[in-house]
C-alpha cells in the first residue's frame, strides 16, 4: 500500500479551438496573369514520350502510304505485253486450224466449233470489259485521294464539293453510309469551307467503314496468329498468311466500294506490297513492342506463340496498307490505324493460349 494521499477530483476547462469557417478555408482562386520570366517555368519530361530512336523505329515499323507515280512504259510491261500478243496470235492460229480441220471431217463439226469459238470470244470480251471497268474504278479512287488531299490543303470549296460528290457516288451502294450521305445532302446549299467539308465527309461517310475495316484487320490478324501457333510446318504458316492477306485486301476493297476484278486485284496487291518491308521492320521494332505490350515478348510467350504474334502483325500491316490504298479519302479527320492498335490484342490472345497450356 502507498502512503501517498490520493489526489482529489478536479474539474478542468478545455479551451475550445476557434472554429474556422468553411469559406475561410477555401483559398481564393489565383487571378490569371501572364508569365513574363520564362526561366521560372521548369519543363518536365512526359513519361509516355518515346525517345528519338524509338519514334524513328516506330515510324519505320508503320510507314504511311504514298502512292507511287509511274510514268511511261517499263521494260516489264513491254515484255509481258509482247508475250501476250504472241500468245493471242498462237491461240488464234490454233483455233483457225482446228475449225478448218473439223470442216474437212464434217460440216456440222466445223459449224459447231465455230459457234463455240464465237461464244468463247464473246465471253472473253466481256471479261476484258469488266476488268477494264474495275481498273478504271481503282484509278478513279486514286485520283479522288489526290483531289481530296489537294482540296483540303488549298481549302478550295469548289474542289472539295466535287471530291465529296465523287465520294457519295462511290458510297451510294454501301448501306453503312446512308446516314452520312443523307446528312451531306441536307448541307448541299450551306456555305462550308473546303477543308471542313472534306473532314465532315470523311467523318460522316468513312468513319463507319473505318470501324468495319479495323474489325476485319483485327480478325484476320487473330486467325493468322492462332493458325501459326498450332500449325506443325512453316510452309503452312506462309501459305495461310498469303491466303488471309489476299482475302483481306479483296474484302477491304469491296468494303470501300472498290470491287476489283482479277487484274484489278493483282494490281491492288502489287500496290499494297510495294511499300511493305514486313520482315525487316518487324525485327527492328522489338523495343517498341516491349513498351507497348508491357514487357518483352520473348519472356512472355513461347517461341511458337511469338511467331504467331509476328505473323499477326504482318497481316495487320498488310491490312493497314490496304486501307491506305483502297480508302477514297486520305486519313485527315480520322486517326490512321497503326500497329499499336493491334499489338495488345494479339499478345493477349497468344498469352491466354500459353496460360491454358
From Swiss-Prot:
Q: Where is this region: Disordered?
A: 1-36
InterPro entries xrefs: DUF697, UPF0283
The cellular location(s) given in this protein's UniProt record come to:
Cell inner membrane
- Transmembrane region positions? 78-98, 109-129
What does UniProt give as GO cellular component?
A: plasma membrane
User: Which residues fall in a compositionally biased region of kind Basic and acidic residues?
Assistant: 27-36
Superkingdom is: Bacteria
Q: How does it sit in the membrane?
A: Multi-pass membrane protein
Entry keywords, A to Z: Cell inner membrane, Cell membrane, Membrane, Transmembrane, Transmembrane helix
The entry sums up its family as follows: Belongs to the UPF0283 family.
Question: What is the protein name for this chain?
Answer: UPF0283 membrane protein BOV_0999
The protein's organism comes out as: Brucella ovis (strain ATCC 25840 / 63/290 / NCTC 10512)
Amino acid at each position: 500500500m502507498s502512503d501517498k494521499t490520493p489526489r482529489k477530483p478536479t474539474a478542468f476547462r478545455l479551451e475550445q479551438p476557434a472554429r474556422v469557417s468553411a469559406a475561410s478555408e477555401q483559398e481564393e482562386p489565383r487571378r490569371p496573369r501572364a508569365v513574363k520570366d520564362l526561366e521560372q517555368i521548369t519543363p518536365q519530361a512526359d513519361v509516355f514520350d518515346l525517345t528519338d530512336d524509338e519514334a524513328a523505329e516506330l515510324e519505320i515499323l508503320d510507314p504511311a502510304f504514298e502512292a507511287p507515280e509511274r510514268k511511261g512504259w517499263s521494260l516489264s510491261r513491254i515484255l509481258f505485253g509482247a508475250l501476250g500478243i504472241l500468245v493471242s496470235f498462237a491461240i488464234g492460229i490454233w483455233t483457225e486450224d482446228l475449225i478448218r480441220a473439223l470442216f474437212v471431217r464434217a460440216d456440222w463439226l466445223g459449224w459447231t466449233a465455230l459457234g463455240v469459238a464465237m461464244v468463247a470470244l464473246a465471253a472473253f470480251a466481256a471479261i476484258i470489259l469488266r476488268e477494264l471497268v474495275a481498273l478504271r474504278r481503282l484509278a478513279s479512287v486514286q485520283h479522288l485521294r489526290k483531289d481530296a488531299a489537294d482540296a483540303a490543303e488549298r481549302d478550295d470549296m469548289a474542289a472539295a464539293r466535287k471530291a465529296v460528290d465523287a465520294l457519295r457516288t462511290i458510297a451510294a451502294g454501301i448501306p453503312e453510309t446512308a446516314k452520312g450521305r443523307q446528312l451531306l445532302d441536307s448541307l448541299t446549299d450551306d456555305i462550308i469551307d473546303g477543308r471542313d467539308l472534306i473532314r465532315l465527309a470523311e467523318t460522316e461517310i468513312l468513319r463507319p467503314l473505318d470501324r468495319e475495316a479495323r474489325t476485319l484487320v483485327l480478325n484476320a490478324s487473330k486467325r493468322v496468329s492462332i493458325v501459326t501457333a498450332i500449325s506443325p510446318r512453316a510452309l503452312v504458316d506462309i501459305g495461310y498468311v498469303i491466303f488471309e492477306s489476299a482475302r483481306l485486301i479483296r474484302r477491304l476493297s469491296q468494303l470501300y466500294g472498290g470491287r476489283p476484278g482479277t487484274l484489278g486485284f493483282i494490281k491492288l496487291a502489287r500496290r499494297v506490297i510495294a511499300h511493305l518491308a514486313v520482315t525487316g521492320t518487324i525485327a527492328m521494332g522489338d523495343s517498341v513492342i516491349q513498351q507497348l505490350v508491357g514487357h518483352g515478348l520473348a519472356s512472355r510467350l513461347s517461341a511458337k506463340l511469338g511467331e504467331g504474334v509476328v505473323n499477326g502483325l504482318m497481316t495487320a500491316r498488310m491490312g493497314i496498307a490496304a486501307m491506305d490504298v483502297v480508302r477514297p479519302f486520305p486519313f485527315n479527320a480520322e486517326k490512321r490505324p497503326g500497329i499499336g492498335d493491334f499489338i495488345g490484342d494479339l499478345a493477349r490472345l497468344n498469352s491466354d493460349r500459353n496460360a491454358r497450356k
